[in-house]
A protein has these predicted regions:
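Structural signal for interior beta-strand "rungs" in well-ordered beta-sheet cores
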Residues: 2-217, 222-223
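A glycine/serine/threonine-rich, flexible loop-to-helix segment
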Residues: 213, 227-234
Length: 234
């Protein structure tokens, strides 16, 4: 093991977990079986790594064994965060206090997931994306590289809100393309696509796809202007 026992009181590491070199643990961390933690990671107090999903009898979610949680080198997982089995985080990711990453998520390198963020199952997040505090990323979303999600953004994936059996085939989260930015408190309806380098203003309710470089505001969101050249990624 790569830590002095007296510096990680209450640490529980299940058989079959793989811990890299120079890993630092806080108090009362739980590492479930099969979890892989890369070199140089820091795990905060009361974090839970590799948790298996608990599904209701009525859930249609995938019930297959999700596989291990894998953390790339240099990840920082903060206090009280819960990361499920079957997800992968690339090198240098930061997960804030009390954040949740559900099963079968694929997260690139140097992604920031802020305090209290919930990333639901089967979501993909590209490298260098930032998701700020208390945002909700629903299941089956795609966020490409260099996306910025401001605090308290809500994404949705079910237009039928739990009614009709046919809804299961039509569940789809948002697609947010490279370099797009979504302002605080905005709401994205199911299946919405936010184009590359687009900008969604704070509090907007997005009911239609947003074209690349469009700046939209309001409820329902409407185009105000184009994103200026000086704000574009290189």
């Amino acid at each position: 093991m790569s830590w002095p026992a007296d510096q990680a009181p209450g640490l529980t590491v299940a058989e079959g977990a793989a811990i890299g070199g120079d890993v630092r643990f806080g108090a009362n961390v739980t590492v479930h079986a099969g979890t892989v933690i890369g070199d140089g990671c820091t795990i905060g107090d009361n974090a839970v790594l590799g948790k298996r999903p608990t599904l209701s009898s009525r859930s249609r979610a995938d019930r297959q064994e999700p596989g291990p949680l894998t953390l790339g080198a240099g990840c920082a997982i903060s206090a009280g965060a819960v990361l499920a089995a079957g997800s992968t985080l690339g090198p240098g990711c930061v997960v804030g206090d009390l954040a949740t990453v559900r099963e079968r998520c694929s997260i690139g390198e140097q992604v920031v997931i802020g305090r209290g963020v919930c990333v639901e199952n089967d979501t993909t997040i590209g490298s260098f994306t930032k998701i700020q505090s208390n945002a909700y990323i629903t299941a089956h979303c795609l966020l490409e590289e260099h996306v910025f999600i401001a605090p308290c953004v809500v994404t949705t994936n079910d237009n039928f809100m739990g009614r009709t059996e046919g809804r299961h085939a039509r569940i789809k989260g948002a697609v947010i393309r490279r370099g797009a930015r979504v302002g605080g408190g905005a709401t994205l309806l199911p299946g919405i696509e936010i184009g590359e380098e687009a900008f969604v203003g704070a509090g907007a309710v997005v009911t239609r796809d947003v074209a690349p470089r469009a700046l939209v505001v309001g409820s329902p969101a409407r185009v105000l202007r184009q994103v200026p050249d000086e704000e574009l990624l290189g």
